A protein has these predicted regions:
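A translation/RNA-centric and nucleic-acid-associated enzymatic feature enriched
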Residues: 1-129
Length: 129
């Protein structure tokens, strides 16, 4: 990610870079495969100064396609019955993303460690404020 960020800063003067179409095997089972090439997904990461700050993409909304992908990966459906039930009864097309506010803040203020941009950081040696 850092090298991608450096490249686009030098070549295009851009701090923000979208990386799209990740390999299907590297994304969660619910990520929608690209209909033009099912080895890739309709997903993205947004990098800011070489750090991933957002991940997102289109999700599978078809029950049969979702089950096909689950089976292809050899996953068990035990414990996912309620989740899968929603798809059986009809799920509209949808997508989503998640933004790492602490990561974005870290980059904006020029910190080296995300703990410095987090109000109450947690790690292996700190579980309480």
């Amino acid at each position: 990610e850092l090298l991608i960020g450096q490249y686009f800063k030098e070549e295009c003067g851009a701090d923000f870079v979208f990386v799209t179409h990740y390999p299907s095997k590297k994304r969660p089972f619910y990520a929608m495969d690209d209909p033009e090439d099912e080895t890739f997904t309709l997903s993205f990461d947004l990098l800011y100064k070489g750090l991933e700050i957002t991940t997102g993409g289109q999700r599978i909304h078809d029950y049969n396609k979702l089950m096909e992908k689950i089976n292809k990966r050899g996953m068990e459906t035990e414990g996912m019955e309620h989740y899968l039930s929603a798809f059986k009864h009809g799920m509209p097309p949808h997508g989503g993303l998640g933004i790492g506010l602490e990561r974005l803040t870290m980059q904006l203020i020029g910190e080296e460690n995300v703990r410095e941009a987090t109000l109450f950081p947690r790690d292996l040696s700190r579980l309480e404020p």
